[in-house]
A protein has these predicted regions:
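Conserved beta-strand signature within the Rossmann-like core of class I S-adenosyl-L-methionine
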Residues: 134-143
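A conserved beta-strand element that flanks and buttresses the S-adenosyl-L-methionine
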Residues: 111
Length: 202
């Protein structure tokens, strides 16, 4: 996001709130760790995590014993400070997914979870993730794509926040144009549904 995060944005990216909200326990984290482990058995891989939340992806990869060279990015200094304090062994950088300061094919895997819903739209971010990925892109949604598309920009006195639901048709068409294979997993955690796309880059 090109805008400076508003106070509302900072509150809604609060690390403790994410844990209370149950996002840390979502089965998508374990699914992603298992698939990455299967794709790179016994080998190290480099991974860029876009929108790090509470650092849960890094923790899941570490707890699974995967030798991942991890870099996490987020637009929120508050989130990054919390991640640095809790996980000093990883790299945490302030950066927007729509303007990644890395060269083409820098990372074996590029991952994002519950990030694209919070952007004004997804295409720039998706193309940037594919640009810097060498082999795989993983995209997870808590706001599962379905028609009709709903682009929700919630205005407040303190700024705004997006919570979009995308039409799966155009979104998945973009993924297939950029990928030679797209694997989809639909998961459930209590009442919450999530969807993960695991893309193998062309």
């Amino acid at each position: 996001m090109g805008d400076v995060p508003s106070p509302l944005w900072l509150r809604t990216t609060d690390v403790d709130h994410m844990r209370r909200d149950g996002r840390d326990e979502d089965p998508g984290h374990a699914w992603t760790s298992e698939r990455i482990g299967a794709l790179y058995p016994g080998a190290s891989c480099s991974l860029l995590d876009c929108g790090v939340m509470s650092g849960v992806t890094y923790a899941g990869l570490r707890d699974a014993g995967l030798p991942v060279d991890y870099t996490g990015i987020d637009v929120s200094p508050r989130v990054l400070d919390a991640c640095r304090a809790e996980h000093p062994g990883a790299r945490w950088l302030e950066m927007s997914v729509t303007d990644l300061a890395f060269g083409e094919g820098t990372f074996d895997v590029v991952n994002s979870r519950h990030l694209l819903e919070c952007l004004p739209y997804y295409e720039t971010a998706v193309r940037e993730m594919f640009r810097v990925a060498r082999t795989h892109v993983v995209i997870g949604f808590f706001q599962v794509p379905r028609a009709p598309e709903a682009l929700l920009r919630r205005e407040t006195d303190e700024g705004y926040i997006w919570l979009n639901r995308y039409d799966p048709g155009p979104f998945e068409e973009l993924l297939h144009r950029l990928s030679r294979e797209v694997e989809t997993a639909d998961l459930r955690h209590g009442p919450r549904r999530s969807r993960i796309y695991l893309c193998t880059k062309r």
